[in-house]
């Protein structure tokens, strides 16, 4: 691939380098999401009487990974 630009559905997408702001927002959202994910994990543990597939930290990581890009979307 000669160029770092991708074209999909008529829109150009440029590969972006992760910026310090992204890491900062990701870590802040992760810190806030961990307690809520822990509560959700415990509730699922009690409700289903078995250990959920992903742990509370993995759940918080996934949520932070979904929320943070939405902040920087143009």
From Swiss-Prot:
Keywords: Bacteriochlorophyll biosynthesis, Chlorophyll biosynthesis, Photosynthesis. This is Protein pufQ. It holds the Pfam family PufQ. Required for bacteriochlorophyll biosynthesis. Directly involved in the assembly of both the B875 and B800-850 pigment-protein complexes. Belongs to the PufQ family. One of its GO terms (biological process) is bacteriochlorophyll biosynthetic process. InterPro entries: PufQ_cyt-su.
